[in-house]
Regions:
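Amphipathic alpha-helical linker/stalk segments
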Residues: 89-117, 138, 161-169
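Hydrophobic alpha-helical connector segments
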Residues: 88, 103-129, 184, 188, ...
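Helix-turn-helix
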Residues: 42, 50-84, 88
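Generic hydrophobic, amphipathic alpha-helix propensity
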Residues: 39-48, 64, 85, 89-101, ...
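N-terminal intrinsically disordered/low-complexity leader segments
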Residues: 1-38, 172, 176, 226-233
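Amphipathic alpha-helical packing segments from all-alpha helical-bundle domains
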Residues: 95-99, 125, 145-171, 182-187, ...
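Hydrophobic alpha-helical segments that form the core
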Residues: 2-20, 176-198, 209-221
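Amphipathic alpha-helical segments used for helix-helix packing
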Residues: 126-148, 162-165, 194-201, 231
Length: 233
């Protein structure tokens, strides 16, 4: 998925924006100007770092510009303001995360357990590779427009998980109401998100030590539901 947020790789902030052609610095050395796309990636990387550290309300365009090595005016050439910059990081990051999950599930064997494990593994990979973006995605903000965007993105993720559950033959055989499937999607998404947040707070824990317990927690319960198990009265 090609977006300016992808991998959030920083580009050298000492270079000036341009078309990629060589220029001379004050020592006469030849160096290459950054393209507009490269400069935008530099701004996004710096913004993600500042937002992750300061939060949306505490971040300032001046600080982002300084971190990116650009002027405030250059940021406004790419984004209307702080809200659009923040929303861009959140929306692109959420979309990339969900795309990875769905692609991994689709590429796995038809077995539902393997699909779930592949999807969860892809999600944890995203969080590990893009911790700054994930921290921004998970922040609480006071801006109503950002909150509305956050709610919409969360619902899209939950609905995508619910659609995968609904396509499972054993789940379909249980004749669940759509609302019940939707609720399962909410719970699975919530468990994955909480596990990812815990992992970021405990980075010394090996990825396999996160994936294993979370997978067991999700699958053992889900498998019983798929088989029609009921709690005794």
């Amino acid at each position: 998925m090609a977006t300016p947020v992808e991998r959030m790789e920083p580009v050298p902030v000492s270079s000036r924006p341009g078309d990629g052609s060589p220029v001379a610095d004050h020592n006469g050395a030849r160096r290459r100007r950054l393209t507009g796309a490269q400069r935008q990636r530099s701004i996004l990387y710096a913004a993600a770092e500042v937002f992750a550290r300061r939060g949306y309300d505490g971040a300032r365009i001046e600080e982002i510009a300084e971190a990116a090595g650009v002027s405030k005016g250059l940021i406004y050439e790419h984004f209307k303001g702080k809200r659009e910059l923040y929303a861009h990081i959140r929306s692109k990051g959420t979309a990339e995360s969900l795309d990875r999950v769905l692609e991994a599930a689709a590429a796995a064997d038809a077995d539902s357990r393997q699909q779930l494990e592949a999807a969860l593994s892809a999600f944890l990979d995203f969080v590990a590779e893009q911790p700054l973006v994930w921290q921004v995605i998970e922040q609480e903000v006071s801006d109503p427009e950002i909150n509305a965007l956050m709610q919409s993105q969360q619902q899209r993720s939950e609905q995508a998980i619910a659609a995968l559950l609904a396509a499972d033959e054993l789940m379909a055989a249980q004749d669940f109401d759509p609302e019940q499937i939707e609720l399962l999607g909410v719970m699975i998404n919530g468990a994955a998100v909480r596990a990812a947040n815990w992992w970021l707070a405990n980075p010394s824990v090996d990825r396999r030590q996160v994936l294993g317990p979370v997978m067991q927690f999700m699958w053992l319960g889900l498998e019983q539901i798929r088989l029609g198990a009921q709690l005794a009265d």
